[in-house]
Amino acid sequence: MKVIICSDSHGAFAAAEQVLEQQPEAAAVLFLGDGAEEWDDLHEIYPQIPFYPVRGNCDWGCDWPAERIVELGGHRIFCTHGHLYGVKAACTALLEKKAAAENCDIVLYGHTHLAKIEYREERYFLNPGSLRQPMEGHPSY
């Protein structure tokens, strides 16, 4: 199962659309916030792809949830933007507690614009980076 995980597109409609065009077999999109306007539009253009968004700190007026749990491919996935869990301070302790409390084996978050994947406490922690303003210099998802 291929799932698109992305975050922090900050208005980069063309980049976000390119991701969808390059992954036509994607079973779902998990969007982790800060780009509600373009992803709302893209969801209307590509309604056949299941879409599970959460809002970020820059998604003012958006009615998406701040966090959600998605069950896909036998995994229980906790999705959040990360700003409510202090991830910019390079600390994921609050995310770890939340994932344990919700019995999730995968944690997805954004906000830092820095792609990262870790495995600890029997869970994957993944930040896809940013489509528009990546800290590493190249867009990532």
Report the location of each language-model feature:
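Short, flexible, glycine/charge-rich loop motifs used to bind or transfer phosphoryl groups or to couple energy/partner
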Residues: 18-21, 40-44, 67-68, 95-98, ...
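Short active-site segment of divalent metal-dependent hydrolases/proteases
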Residues: 11, 37, 84, 114, ...
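Short glycine/proline-enriched coil/turn segments at helix->beta-strand junctions
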Residues: 24-28, 46-50, 75, 103-104, ...
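Helix-adjacent hinge/juxtasegments
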Residues: 52-102
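N-terminal active-site segment of His-dependent metallophosphoesterases
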Residues: 1-49, 59-61, 65-66, 138-141
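Active-site neighborhood of phospho(di)ester-bond hydrolases with catalytic His/Asp-centered motifs
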Residues: 5-7, 28-34, 52-57, 79-81, ...
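Beta-strand-turn-beta hairpins that frame and shape the catalytic cleft
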Residues: 1-3, 69-78, 119-125
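Conserved beta-sheet core of the metallophosphoesterase superfamily
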Residues: 52, 88-141
